């Protein structure tokens, strides 16, 4: 619906430009060029519902001030029926929607899939989370998971085909340290502290790592395990490695599932060694003359302005994570049209190396990377290596507990059984929303008072959805059978809500094109705010336009739920 009225506005301006008589100065100007011809949402409804900046693009060609050009465009423009008026406000051409005409059409258009864009002929392989399976997910990982999953949801709504992958580091040193703890120190996973198996494995890893720090002579034992597992010739050893990884992944998947995250595929890095793909790739580099030999086998990247060499093999002949990662990226490139990685900012050098190797040596399209800064609690950052971390499980438990306490204080008559599901929805929603609301490039400190605020946080948005559900239920009517009155002329509160609902598809398109999700959180806040303003000011049940307003409430509820779904935030029907 939004794109329809946008097209009408663009066509109207295009027709107006055709009427210009300026000695062929517009001869080479293409009005279809999106870079020169775009519409925006004005910051204030008093300035209209849509605005064009085309006067800026024409100023140099016409050698006129943009505000004069905007006025000329408006003079020559024929106003489409969907608009009440068009005005030149400064250098902008501003369109004002005729809400007596538009509102009924919009409310009839909005359905359960509202916001979903047409299918695009593009498949994206999106890798996110990919934490080492040597312990539970901690708060340092969770921004990757939440951003990656929300981006996956956004891109799917925007019409892209997306496959999410978790890259499993089964050949990493961390797993070998755990196997060392089991096979040589006699440690047992089941004997460790923790309610979940990933926590038990994390404790075992910590103990084994401590032992290695105390006795450096044991480090060679870990090196030996890495070499033997990579060789793949010992079924019993392979089984121990694989059971450790699979067990830890069970716990990690459980954590991810609790915060509404699931992956389509888990790809083990070992498969690229066992299949010979890593060896074949190194042989190719060698054949092309890019491999250097010394203590290690490496590619010298200084000719590509990267000082640090890209190591392919250790002195003992084993491959590195970076080598296997390169093979994995080549594999991903065969699975889709776009390869998209979500990586912490500490991976920038490695990503730069991969980028150069793909472009300059392999002559292939490199992966697209979105970097994020790390998230901390006010007390500081965390590390699994030192055994001092706040796990995602603990973070969610704390969020749910705080939410339950707040619900209880506001609703003392509710039972614990009634509170439990609401607290889970609010706690999970608070974490996901708070982390999603900031651009990934910015450092984020997790603040409980902001995240769980029932006035400003995600809970206030969830409450708007629950409030709409309660109102519809209270009406006792089947909203699907209700019709919008033909003579309904919306007031200012209704207009504001309709205007906000109408923006949703454009917000989806903009965010998907930029591959960023934080503006979805802002949209949720705007929509919840517009609904709450309407709810407080306008009578619905018992009003002269009861059916129409019930339809408006239902469409606001649907849009808000769809927006929250993109963020992976529950939309409770009761709070």
Swiss-Prot record:
Known EC number: 6.1.1.19
Catalysed reactions listed for this entry: tRNA(Arg) + L-arginine + ATP = L-arginyl-tRNA(Arg) + AMP + diphosphate
Organism domain of life: Archaea
Short motif 'HIGH' region, span: 131-141
UniProt keyword annotation of Ubl conjugation present: no
GO cellular component terms attached to this protein's record: cytoplasm
InterPro entries given in the database record: aa-tRNA-synth_I_CS (IPR001412), Arg-tRNA-ligase (IPR001278), Arg-tRNA-synth_N (IPR005148), Arg-tRNA-synth_N_sf (IPR036695), ArgRS_core (IPR035684), DALR_anticod-bd (IPR008909), Rossmann-like_a/b/a_fold (IPR014729), tRNAsynth_Ia_anticodon-bd (IPR009080)
Family: Belongs to the class-I aminoacyl-tRNA synthetase family.
Protein's name according to its UniProt entry: Arginine--tRNA ligase
């Amino acid at each position: 619906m939004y794109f329809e009225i946008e097209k009408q506005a663009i066509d109207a301006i295009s027709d107006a430009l055709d009427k210009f008589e300026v000695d062929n100065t517009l001869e080479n100007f293409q009005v279809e060029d999106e870079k020169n011809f775009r519409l925006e949402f004005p910051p204030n409804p008093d300035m209209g519902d849509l605005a064009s900046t085309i006067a800026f693009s024409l100023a140099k060609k016409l050698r006129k001030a943009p505000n004069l050009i905007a006025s000329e465009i408006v003079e020559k423009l024929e106003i489409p029926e969907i608009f009440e008026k068009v005005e030149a406000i400064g250098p902008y051409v501003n369109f004002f929607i005729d809400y007596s005409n538009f509102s009924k059409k919009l409310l009839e258009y909005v359905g359960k899939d509202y916001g979903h864009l047409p299918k695009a002929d593009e498949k994206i392989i999106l890798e996110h989370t990919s934490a080492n399976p040597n312990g539970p997910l901690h708060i340092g990982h969770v921004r990757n998971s939440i951003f990656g999953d929300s981006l996956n949801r956004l891109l799917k709504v925007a019409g892209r085909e997306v496959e999410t992958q978790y890259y499993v580091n089964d050949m990493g040193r961390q797993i070998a340290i755990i196997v060392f703890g089991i096979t040589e120190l006699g440690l047992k996973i089941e004997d460790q502290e923790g309610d979940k198996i990933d926590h038990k494995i994390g404790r075992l890893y910590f103990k084994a790592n401590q032992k290695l720090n105390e006795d450096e002579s044991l480090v060679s034992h870990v090196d030996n395990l890495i070499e033997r597992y990579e060789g793949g010739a010992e079924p019993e050893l392979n089984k121990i490695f694989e059971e450790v990884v699979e067990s830890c992944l069970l716990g990690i998947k459980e954590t991810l599932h609790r915060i509404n995250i699931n992956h389509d595929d888990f790809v083990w890095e070992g498969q690229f060694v066992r299949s010979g793909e890593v060896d074949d790739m190194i042989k190719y580099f060698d054949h092309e003359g890019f491999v250097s030999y010394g203590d290690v086998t490496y590619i010298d990247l200084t000719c590509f302005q990267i000082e640090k060499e890209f190591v392919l093999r250790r002195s003992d002949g084993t491959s590195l994570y970076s080598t296997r990662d390169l093979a994995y990226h080549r594999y991903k490139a065969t699975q889709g049209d776009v390869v998209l990685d979500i990586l912490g900012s500490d991976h920038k050098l490695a990503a730069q190396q991969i980028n150069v190797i793909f472009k300059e040596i392999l002559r292939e399209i490199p992966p697209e990377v979105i970097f994020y800064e790390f998230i901390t609690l006010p007390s500081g950052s965390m590390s699994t290596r030192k055994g001092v971390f706040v796990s995602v499980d603990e973070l969610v438990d704390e969020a749910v507990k705080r939410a339950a306490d707040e619900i209880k204080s506001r609703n003392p008559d509710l039972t614990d059984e009634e509170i439990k599901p609401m607290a889970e929805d609010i706690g999970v929603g608070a974490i996901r929303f708070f982390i999603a609301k900031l651009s990934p490039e910015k450092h984020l400190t997790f603040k409980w008072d902001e995240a769980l605020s029932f006035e400003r946080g995600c809970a206030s948005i969830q409450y708007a959805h629950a409030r709409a559900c309660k109102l519809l239920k209270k009406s006792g009517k089947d909203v699907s059978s209700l019709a919008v009155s033909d003579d309904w002329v919306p007031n200012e509160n209704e207009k504001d809500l309709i205007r906000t609902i109408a923006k949703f598809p454009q917000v989806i398109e903009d965010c998907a094109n930029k591959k960023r999700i934080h503006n979805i959180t802002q949209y949720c806040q705007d929509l919840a705010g517009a609904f709450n303003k309407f709810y407080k000011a306008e009578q619905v049940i018992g009003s002269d336009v009861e059916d129409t307003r019930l339809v408006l409430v239902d469409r606001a509820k649907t849009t808000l739920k769809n927006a929250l779904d993109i963020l992976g935030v529950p939309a409770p029907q009761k709070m």
